[in-house]
């Protein structure tokens, strides 16, 4: 995922947590916030949160790679900041299910590009 499509600063994550809307399913929570008007046509940015309850660093990084790769394939409206928070049940999911659950959340949040 290109750098301009990633959320990197903790300030951005805090803004989304405070002012964003949320949707969830059994494996993920999606937080989304529309960006300022001057960024309305900019590509949407993604962030990923996995707590230490998920597992050790190797396991968390494996799931993060799968989530990043799945997010690359999502067709999302421009001008949004989106954070995916993995729940502990992510252990029950394989890559195809991760992709499907993330896609369903984006669709349910009405963030899918036309």
List the predicted regions and their residue ranges.
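Positively charged, solvent-exposed patches that mediate nucleic-acid binding
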Residues: 1-114
């Amino acid at each position: 995922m290109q750098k301009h499509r990633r959320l990197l600063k903790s300030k951005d994550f805090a803004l989304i947590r405070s002012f964003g809307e949320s949707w969830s399913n059994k494996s993920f929570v999606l937080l989304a916030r529309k960006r300022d008007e001057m960024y309305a046509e900019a590509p949407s940015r993604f962030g990923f949160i996995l707590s230490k309850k998920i597992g050790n660093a190797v396991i968390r990084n494996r799931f993060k790679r799968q989530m990043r790769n799945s997010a690359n394939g999502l067709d999302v409206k421009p001008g949004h900041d989106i954070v995916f928070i993995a729940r502990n049940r992510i252990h029950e999911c394989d890559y195809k299910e991760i992709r499907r659950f993330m896609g369903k959340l984006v669709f349910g949040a009405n963030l899918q590009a036309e």
